[in-house]
């Protein structure tokens, strides 16, 4: 009897709740202070896996490998935006990058949910909750030392390894070991498989299945090593891709820069085949390369397709809006324009380059979505998406 009374009371309360304004039952939202708040946006969370399959483990049993973890977040008061957003992290990271920031501030996933979007966050294959089966694709996992993170991401001004590093001001705290925010960030870094071809192929396969499951065109947003994943997923599922946002994607085309100058990415932006017209069967001969002069001081030369023969076209991407975002102080600042030029040369005429410094957003490094002014940047992306 007591249970029935409780159930009736709960039902009545739930019936009343439908008439209450949005936010009822949750703590009031604090002033955003440019996005830095102490609590995340309430959401409905579920998770699932896509891709992968069973393989023989060599001893009479089977294991499951190459699967990708996906976390789905929905606004508690319902989705009000028609385009889902898929968030893809970079090397040595997991999907936690887009949850709350290392300083405790509200992350981009929370902002997108609050703005009414259906959000999907992945852990790339072999990363985080997407388990790697030892021996497949690499003999052992790789890691980034704390020193590398300091030098390239969080305390770049102290090392000054590229000209734009002097502009870095937005990382909260010192960006060095022992600082509370740095320690929170570095403790979230994970091992990774240093095999770009295997990584890209498995993410492409799993990502295509993710888009099939979502069932309608999405915005693919990727960062750094994960920044080229929107390209390869969109190439596999162009009809389910509405737009691509590339946050300082791996680059520049055909070569490394800043920390090395070795040849890389045989297909221009990727290590695996993507769809060109005319078809590329051997990238070493079919993609004729040409070096173009640097656009100015403190920038690198670009290796792009040659002017003759006519540059091959990325036919599955030519009609897609693409936004490439570069921060003012990152090691990408000297070369991201090469990636933009490569895409435009390959027929992607809707490619735009958002250089944050030129847009009046100053002081950011490579992990700008975690930095003090991250909400200011997210609002620019929100406006771009809404204008599609």
Predicted regions and their residues:
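Gly/Ala-rich beta-loop-alpha elbow adjacent to hydrolase catalytic centers
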Residues: 221-230
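Catalytic active-site module of serine/aspartate enzymes centered on a nucleophile-bearing elbow/loop
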Residues: 359-388
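Fungal secretory targeting signals
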Residues: 1-21
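Conserved alpha/beta-hydrolase "acid-adjacent" motif
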Residues: 229, 331-338
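Short, surface-exposed "cap/lid" segments of acyl-processing enzymes
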Residues: 77-163, 167
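Short beta-strand/loop motif that positions the catalytic acidic residue
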Residues: 318, 324-326
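Conserved acidic catalytic loop of the alpha/beta-hydrolase fold
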Residues: 163, 170-172, 176-219
């Amino acid at each position: 009897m007591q249970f029935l009374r409780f159930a009736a009371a709960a039902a009545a309360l739930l019936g009343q709740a439908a008439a209450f304004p949005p936010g009822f039952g949750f703590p009031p939202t604090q002033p955003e202070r440019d996005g830095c708040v102490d609590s995340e946006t309430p959401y409905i969370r579920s998770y699932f896996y896509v891709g992968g399959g069973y393989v023989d483990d060599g001893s009479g049993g089977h294991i499951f490998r190459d699967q990708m973890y996906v976390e789905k977040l929905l606004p508690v008061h319902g989705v009000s935006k028609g385009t889902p957003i898929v968030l893809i992290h970079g090397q040595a990271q997991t999907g936690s990058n887009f949850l709350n920031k290392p300083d405790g501030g509200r992350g981009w996933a929370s902002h997108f949910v609050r703005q009414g979007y259906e959000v999907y966050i992945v852990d790339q294959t072999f990363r985080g909750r997407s388990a790697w089966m030892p021996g497949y694709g690499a003999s052992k996992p790789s890691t980034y030392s704390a020193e590398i993170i300091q030098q390239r991401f969080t305390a770049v001004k102290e090392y000054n390894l590229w000209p734009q590093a002097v502009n870095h001001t937005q990382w909260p705290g010192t960006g060095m070991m022992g600082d509370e925010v740095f320690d929170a960030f570095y403790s979230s870094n994970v091992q990774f498989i240093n095999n770009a071809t295997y990584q890209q192929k498995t993410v492409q396969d799993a990502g295509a299945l993710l888009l099939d499951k979502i069932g309608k065109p999405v915005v693919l947003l990727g960062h750094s090593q994960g920044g080229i994943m929107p390209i390869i997923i969109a190439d596999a599922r162009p009809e389910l891709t509405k737009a691509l946002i590339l946050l300082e994607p791996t680059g520049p085309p055909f070569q490394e820069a800043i920390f090395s100058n070795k040849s890389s990415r045989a297909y221009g932006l990727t290590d695996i085949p993507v769809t060109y017209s005319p078809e590329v069967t051997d990238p070493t001969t079919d993609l004729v390369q040409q070096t173009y002069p640097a656009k100015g001081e403190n920038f690198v030369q670009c290796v792009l397709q040659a002017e003759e023969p006519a540059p091959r076209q990325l036919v599955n991407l030519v009609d897609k809006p693409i936004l490439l975002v570069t921060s003012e102080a990152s090691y990408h600042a000297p070369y991201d324009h090469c990636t933009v030029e490569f895409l435009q040369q390959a027929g992607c005429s809707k490619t735009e380059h958002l250089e944050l410094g030129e847009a009046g957003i100053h002081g950011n490094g490579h992990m700008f979505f975690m930095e003090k002014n991250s909400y200011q940047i997210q609002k620019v992306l929100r406006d771009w998406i809404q204008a599609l």
